Regions:
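Mature, solvent-exposed C-terminal subdomains and processed small-chain segments of exported/organellar
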Residues: 1-57, 62-156
Length: 156
């Protein structure tokens, strides 16, 4: 599913956090619901934001193709339940903290920092020559997401 624009850094960071909370964190609700229904041997998500039209996907490895409707139904049902009843506050906070830590640490393993920063610059510069540093200026976004999460979670 296409999600917004690659130039919307806040939306992209927020969807990375959601992908973590829904599919990667321990006890992630969408992943757990699919595994409990025996849809595939493993479930994972992916949010690809280095392109103009970022996309979000959910993959069930070794799933039966005939269970496609069940797969979609479980995802929709789980997401509707989350919208109705709220989401685990700690999972959202953990996702924000995880991505903020990775951003601050800038540990790219064996890859040179300059190369990785260059790739980050191209994520926005390719589509808007006036915003080459958009993906390098994320600290304020993490602060804003923390406030939004606290506000939204306090309502549930």
């Amino acid at each position: 599913m296409v999600i917004g624009s690659g130039l919307d850094v806040k939306l992209n960071v927020a969807f990375s956090v959601l992908e973590y909370a829904l599919l990667d964190a321990p006890g992630a609700p969408v992943k757990q619901a699919l595994l409990d229904a025996h849809i595939g041997k493993d479930v994972y998500g992916s949010y690809e934001d280095g392109i103009l039209q970022p996309f979000f996907s959910i993959v069930a490895k070794n799933a039966d193709e005939n269970e496609k409707e069940k797969f979609l139904s479980i995802i929709r049902g789980t997401l509707k339940d989350i919208v109705k009843n709220g989401m685990d506050r700690k999972a959202i906070e953990a996702g924000i903290n995880y991505f903020e830590f990775r951003f601050r640490e800038a540990d790219f393993s064996s890859f040179p920092k300059g190369l990785m920063y260059g790739i980050d610059v191209f994520d926005s510069w390719l589509y808007d020559e006036n915003k080459p540093f958009a993906y390098l200026q994320q600290l304020a976004i993490y602060d804003e997401l923390k406030k939004l999460a606290k506000k939204a979670i306090s309502k549930t």
